[in-house]
């Protein structure tokens, strides 16, 4: 008789990581999954070993661990459905955690003491786990096939030809230049019109400090990953469609236009020192041309991805204050 191979605890452990990555595959890099995968696999292995040590049956231990993982990772969805969507009191964390814990406890007891056909149950969960992993392949496959990275050398090649003709004439004592982009912040007249909010004090403060405020400006694009590279390169960037494809969903394809932007290169060419201050958004965390890049501590894409993963789980209500402080 062939011994059954049980892998579903591993599959249920890595599925949430692959699922989250597949849903954000066009907005982040593959590097972000390795730390979460390592942590998850370590925890799954530890739980499986402990359960086997306690009940002396690795097959039943696998079932108990998988039930725990399922309840652990569906917690946020259950919470949203019960409390956020339907306003049910027992959807609150203080009650839902107890309910989830109780469900797992009685299920684990039944598996350990009552379940007879362990082989069939393990086979079924193997199939379910494999199906979930396979469900992430279409998104990941599309990303692997259609992703087209743009190198620094390609940036110059695909830009309009007038780039080399731009020159700057500086005064004898050139000023410091601070280019502050308040992404997603309405201009003053629209704030007043739409939200009835008067921000004239803020604008006046900037103007009194010598800043020029573009009072009637408008973004070239409705999304950050398009508007920021467009602003920093002083042009529309529709030509990117010829390189990555007009139907591409790859947000990362525009990042090199930020990291080697035209404004920074022009200013450096006449002697300016270029300092980039990151907002915490991954598109502005790195630069190919800046002399200095200041980034926020713990604000990289790896931390953001891990934070999103934790928010899916039953541990989030317990660590939310710590996680919020870690993200700040």
PLM features: residue spans?
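Transmembrane and membrane-interface helices of multi-pass
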Residues: 1-148
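Active-site His/Glu-centered metal-binding helix of metallohydrolases
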Residues: 10, 181, 185
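Active-site-proximal alpha/beta segments of enzymes that process anionic O-linked groups
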Residues: 55-76, 80-117, 173-176, 184-328
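Alpha-helical transmembrane signal-anchor/signal-peptide segments
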Residues: 144-164, 174
